[in-house]
Regions:
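Metal- or metallocofactor-binding catalytic centers and their adjacent structured scaffolds
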Residues: 5, 37-114
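Flexible C-terminal active-site loop/helix
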Residues: 6, 11-15, 297-364
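N-terminal small/glycine-rich loop or linker at the start of catalytic domains
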Residues: 115-140, 259
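Active-site mouth loops of central-metabolism enzymes
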Residues: 131-145, 165-166, 194, 198, ...
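Catalytic core of soluble alpha/beta enzymes
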Residues: 163, 169-306, 310, 332-335
Length: 364
């Protein structure tokens, strides 16, 4: 591989509807897009989603990181070069995970096209084997919008839901009641509080007041409150999903001793790219900790495709997948056709199967 061009641009795609949770309200994507071109004229694309409340990044900081190191990345000519740079600059990537994710993904896409292999084969694996099934994520919209969205999901055959907790007890209870009243066999609901509560007793009281049955609680307390989460898990009898509280492999010693209390939400952009996401998933498997392969709100087909590698490789510890929303949420995707779930949350691999790199067709 000989790279002749490497660029980063910001990406803002309008949403079809505003998405709200306890940490943010979004009407557009907030992402960076990296384009890598080889001397042969092949092009690789990468995406990252900076989130200040998750990793401390912004689009501006991602662009500054890119400008500072672009010349070094231009010299990468192989998978070994990419891995060597990532390993040597691990601390720097810890502070710029979404930016590095975009760069790494573009390079993997380009390498795959140069080698005429899909990215998972470039990484030493086998081609993906679908189908993949996604959860429905319900945000904090007003109840009329929530109810309409819920009806659509249920009619489409979804049984796995993630419900954002907004902190208005009556409104949250109404949402839980609507899910319960659906009477869907095998219905699974997990709550995501986006670090809403400061105290364990406060969280316990609120969750019990919702009068629902939940499979897991995501980020109920302040970021990094592992002791509080342990106590809450034991009290409520369900595991805690760590998202903002788990962003790098070095945090495993904090949770490995009691694997039954935890689930990890592995979002590729948050973890700092596919290689690091797979490293975390492998360590989770060794520790007996299940995973969710998650997504940032507003991801395009690029990050959807990358996350499939983690989900496919670690199916034996995978409890849920999030994302693949495509133009269900976005006014448009970068790819045609977009990678997005269909009936029952299922995504077939026919869109990209057998194609090199990411296997996506870019319309924009």
């Amino acid at each position: 591989l000989r790279m002749c061009s490497l660029t980063m641009t910001s990406l803002e795609i309008p949403f079809r509807q505003v998405f709200t949770h306890a940490s943010a309200t979004r009407a557009t994507t907030e992402a960076v897009l990296v384009r890598a071109e080889s001397a042969r004229g092949l092009v690789g694309m990468g995406e990252g989603c900076p989130r200040q409340y998750v990793t401390g990044e912004t689009v501006a900081s991602a662009q500054e990181f890119f400008r500072s190191h672009r010349a070094e990345w231009m010299t990468c000519s192989s998978m070994d070069d990419l891995q060597t740079w990532g390993t040597a600059h691990a601390d720097l990537i810890d502070r710029n995970p979404a930016a590095w994710c975009a760069v790494e993904t573009a390079c993997l896409d380009l390498l795959g096209k140069e080698l005429e292999q899909p990215i998972e084969v470039v990484l030493g694996g086998t081609p993906l084997s679908g189908p993949f099934r996604y959860s429905a994520v319900l945000g904090g919209e007003k109840f009329s919008s929530f109810e309409k969205q819920l009806r659509q999901y249920l009619a489409a055959g979804f049984i796995d839901f993630k419900l954002k907790v907004m902190g208005d007890l009556e409104a949250d209870r109404e949402r839980v009641a609507a899910l319960t009243a659906a009477g869907t066999p095998g219905l699974r609901v997990r709550l995501d509080a986006n670090n809403r509560w400061h105290r364990v007793d406060e969280a316990c009281e609120y969750i019990q007041s919702l009068q629902g049955s939940f499979t897991a609680l995501e980020e109920p307390l302040r970021v990094g409150d592992y002791e509080g989460c342990r106590a809450l898990s034991r009290h409520c009898g369900v595991p805690i999903i760590l998202d903002e509280s788990f962003v790098k492999v070095g945090q495993f010693p904090l949770i490995e001793g009691e694997p039954s209390l935890w689930i990890l939400n592995i979002r590729v952009s948050k973890m700092g790219g596919l290689l690091r996401a797979c490293t975390v998933a492998a360590r989770a498997k060794a520790a007996g900790i299940p995973i969710v392969v998650g997504a940032q709100v507003g991801e395009t087909s690029i990050l959807t495709r990358v996350a499939l590698v983690v989900a496919d490789r670690y199916r034996d510890i995978l409890i849920a997948q999030e994302g693949a929303v495509g133009t269900h949420l976005l006014e448009y995707d970068l790819c045609e056709p977009p990678l997005m779930f269909g009936r029952g949350g299922c995504l077939a691999d026919t869109v990209f199967y057998g194609r090199s790199g990411l296997g996506l067709s870019f319309a924009r």
